[in-house]
UniProtKB/Swiss-Prot annotation:
It is a multi-pass membrane protein. It is found in: Endoplasmic reticulum membrane. Mannosyltransferase involved in glycosylphosphatidylinositol-anchor biosynthesis. Transfers the third mannose to Man2-GlcN-acyl-PI during GPI precursor assembly. GO terms for cellular component: endoplasmic reticulum membrane. The chain crosses the membrane at residues 58-78, 85-105, 128-148, 185-207, 212-232, 235-255, 260-280, 289-309, 319-339, 413-433. It is an enzyme of class 2 (transferase). The gene is GPI10. GO terms for molecular function: alpha-1,2-mannosyltransferase activity. Its EC number is 2.4.1.-. It comes from Eremothecium gossypii (strain ATCC 10895 / CBS 109.51 / FGSC 9923 / NRRL Y-1056) (Yeast). This is GPI mannosyltransferase 3. PANTHER family: GLYCOSYLTRANSFERASE, GPI MANNOSYLTRANSFERASE 3.
Length: 595
């Protein structure tokens, strides 16, 4: 396949993938990407403490801000077009019936432009970021496939890595990446890890895999700049480039190419300076001041134990869960690639072999990530281009070997290569459309089915739903949810680790004793005149109340039984959930006016 065909295929596939997503995976999907962009574009939304304290770079959310501006422009253009039509209709007033029917018709014509603008803008806000992520994911996978081809031609001893017959291995890599479960489930979600994976794939493709011969090339300069920018978005990305950079330096020293070594140092400095300047400019645009979120991120996550506030996982989490989940059904070939060296001739020795370098990067990154207390599947996602490279090359070698031998059972094994991709895509589709879909659907409902509301409240674990990036309503009254602020006052205390063990945020206090929390922080729900005179409450009962079924059964249904609240809508969310607090349906209550 031609490169253009590969890119077109990937984009169309990921666009379908992105538009099919109806579910929620983790809070960062919305709160660390879409919400800051929505705040910047429209002037309202929710900013988490990380954004309030400058721990995050705005480079990734800026992509969505641009899509929001496109949505706004399309909305305005739609309104102007319909207003022109309305004026034309008014000029043709003679054909409009007289009387009440004519007045109603003209009123509808004049109101249509505003309603159409709101509708176009809203759907642009919902689907614009998905188109952006389809492009981001497709770009990352495109360069991952090109990387596989480039490595194959090099390790197959073809000489020039731009020549030779790499079509079979390219098609295999394309099939593996398009049907990979985690790619189908995760790649088009608005996580910065997907953006990081794409930057990593681009930089890896342009990297100097020749041992130093391409250090002076323009492509290698681009690789350094993109890699530096990726490290500024996610500091842990430096673990990839530190290993590859060390191999490159050792190769140059071993071959005594001192001039190229000096060129490398100069290019690294220039690329780093360029990336830092670009990042500072972007963050200045958002924060209104010069700062380096990288430094504040390191302060919180490295120099203090507060990163563990978001959870700890056993040392083997990445080894036994993250890697199998991300690699998917190609796992046997990935493991085989790590344990063997079946690829053809290539450069001899550890230093000169691109495959051995990749193995070192993968092993060391998994080991180092395993040393960090807070672990999530997505933290390893930037390694996906390398996972794909090892899996595709090993599978290609294995298929060639057994095809040449003509083994009878090969046909039975090959049938799995059709079944497993289908199962992989199906599993991702189910999770994308059904599991945890209720927390997204409820925001769509509150946007479309609630014409006005004095207040909307969410009594559930913090950040359980999207926010204004899906609600997109600045005409509502008070909008609130239970919070989960980390203990930032412990940042510079020596015993922060010990205090963290006993620290409880607001969500913890809520679920430790639901009745006590409600009675302490809310006024009586039955009558306004029952509240204690002069007493201030943390929350007021909202007009629309949103809870999980777990909360409803544990407390809320019985508590609200004799109040003005009635259940008005229920959304399926999960059959089961690893966090029991989020189990069951999402329920919406509505409170009629006080009597």
């Amino acid at each position: 396949m031609k490169e253009r065909s590969i890119l077109r295929t990937l984009f169309l596939w990921r666009l379908i993938n992105a538009l099919s997503i109806r579910s929620f995976f983790q809070a960062d999907e919305y709160w660390q990407s879409l919400e800051p962009a929505h705040v910047k574009a429209f002037g309202y939304g929710g900013l988490t403490w990380e954004w309030q304290h400058g721990l995050r770079s705005y480079a990734f959310p800026m992509l969505f801000e641009m899509s929001y501006y496109v949505a706004w422009i399309l909305g305005v253009a739609t309104r102007m077009a319909l207003q022109g039509l309305a004026h034309a209709t008014a000029l043709c007033g003679a054909v409009v019936p007289s009387g009440a029917a004519g007045v109603a018709a003209m009123k509808a014509v004049w109101e249509l432009p505003e309603a159409a603008q709101e509708l176009v803008e809203y759907y642009g806000v919902l689907y614009g970021p998905r188109v952006v992520m389809a492009a981001v994911a497709a770009c990352g996978e495109f360069y991952s496939v090109l990387l596989v081809r480039k490595l194959y031609l090099r390790v197959a001893d073809k000489g020039d890595d731009q020549k030779g017959d790499a079509a079979p291995v390219s098609r295999l890599a394309l099939m593996l990446t398009m049907t990979n479960f985690f790619n189908c489930f995760f790649a088009t979600r608005t996580f910065i890890n997907s953006f990081e994976m794409t930057l990593t794939a681009v930089a890896l493709y342009h990297w100097d895999w020749s041992g130093g011969l391409d250090v002076g090339s323009l492509g290698f300069s681009a690789s350094l700049a993109v890699a530096a920018f990726a490290c500024l978005q996610r500091p842990t990305n430096v673990l990839i480039w530190a290993v590859l950079g060390l191999f490159l330096v050792l190769n140059l020293v071993r071959s005594r190419r001192w001039q190229l070594l000096l060129t490398l140092v100069a290019k690294v400095a220039a690329a780093g300076a360029l990336a830092v300047c670009a990042n500072i400019a972007i963050d200045y645009y958002f924060y209104g001041g010069v700062l380096l979120p990288l430094l504040r991120f390191i302060e919180f996550n490295v120099t203090t134990p507060l990163a563990a506030f978001y959870g700890r996982a056993p040392w083997h989490f990445h080894l036994l869960q993250s890697v199998p989940l991300i690699v998917g059904y190609a796992l046997p070939f990935f493991v085989g690639a790590l344990l063997t060296h079946n690829f053809r001739r290539g450069n001899a020795g550890l230093l000169g072999s691109p495959i051995m370098q990749i193995k070192c990067v993968v092993v060391l990154n998994i080991a180092l990530y395993s040393c960090i207390d807070h672990k999530e599947f997505r933290f390893l996602y930037p390694l996906q281009p390398l996972f794909l490279s090892l899996s595709a090359l090993e599978m290609h070698t294995w298929l060639q070997h057994h095809h040449a031998r003509g083994t009878a059972w090969l046909k039975r094994v090959q049938s799995l290569l059709y079944v497993l991709p289908v199962l992989s895509i199906t599993a991702a589709l189910v999770l994308n459309t059904a599991h945890e879909a209720g927390v997204v659907s409820v925001m769509d409902y509150l946007h479309s089915a609630v014409p006005s509301a004095e207040s909307i409240g969410f009594i559930m674990p913090c950040h359980s739903t999207p926010w204004q990036s899906h609600l997109h309503r600045n005409d509502l009254g008070k909008l609130w949810a239970i919070s989960c602020q980390p203990p930032l006052d412990l940042l510079h205390q020596e015993d922060a680790g010990d205090q963290l063990l006993t620290y409880m945020d607001e969500s913890d206090h809520l679920y430790e004793n639901i009745p006590e929390f409600i009675h302490k922080n809310f006024p009586p729900v039955f009558r306004r005149d029952l509240r204690s005179p002069g007493r201030q409450y943390a929350y007021e009962w909202p007009e629309f109340l949103v809870v999980f079924e777990h909360m409803d059964e544990a407390f809320m249904k019985e508590y609200l039984k004799d109040s003005n609240y009635v259940e008005v809508k229920r959304f399926f969310n999960t059959l089961s959930h690893w966090d029991s607090r989020r189990a069951g349906d999402v329920i919406v209550y509505h409170k009629s006016p006080w009597y």
